[in-house]
Amino acid sequence: MLLIAGVGIRAFRDLSRPEAWDYWKDQYVSPSLTASVITKLDLDGAAGGRRALFVSGTIGPAAANWFRGKLDEAHLTKGDMIVLSSPGGDLNQAAIIGEIIRSRGLVTAVGIADATGRVKPSYCASACVLVFAGGKPRFGVLGSALGVHRFVATRPIGDPVAETQRIAGAVLGYMTKMGVSSSIVEAMSETREIRWLGPKEALAMNLITDPVGRP
């Protein structure tokens, strides 16, 4: 699924295009995301004891390709977890990562995982929420935060209002597919600043499906 036409997993051949350098840098030179494998998560209840991939950082223009490679290296199987800590980033790449997570039957949570597998609270905002939505189920770690805001076009557009509406429609379609209530798009539309969702609000939206009592 591409939220903005012409953007997705791709290998640029024409390096004269400005965005090509950003892609190659994110893919091969200095990826904007980092990852580490956790062999056994220390989390409460059904979320605990799983193998996990901890992913943190900003979602860059080549993040989906990078993520697929890290998944293959981690040897995660259905029911394993992606633990997220990210301020957001590229909307299209986030949606593709969410689709990859869903296609592999992985679950998601927000937090920071150390080498022992213990998870501490963290945050997942903006485009990261689309990645989080790809999980099934989606665990809510006590103290972690999910933040949303209105997405707008980042490149010059002839009709920015129409483009913003189109992006909102695409996000709505994606979230609906992932089983999240349409009310999340209403929350996004309220502000361009990050709006942090309360635990009960995220649960009511079905963004969080399984609260975790102890991080």
Question: Could you describe each region identified by the protein language model?
Answer:
Residues 59-80:
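A short, well-ordered alpha-helical element
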Residues 26, 30, 36-66:
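STAS-typified acidic loop motif
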Residues 102, 106-152:
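Glycine-rich beta-to-alpha active-site loop
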Residues 78-93, 107-114:
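Short, glycine-/small-residue-enriched flexible loop/hinge segments at domain edges that mediate gating
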Residues 55, 82, 132, 202:
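Terminal peptide-recognition signature
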Residues 17-28:
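Alpha-helical transmembrane signal-anchor/signal-peptide segments
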Residues 149-215:
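Charged, glycine-interspersed solvent-exposed loop segments at helix/strand-loop junctions
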Residues 1-14:
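Hydrophobic membrane-insertion alpha-helices, especially the h-region
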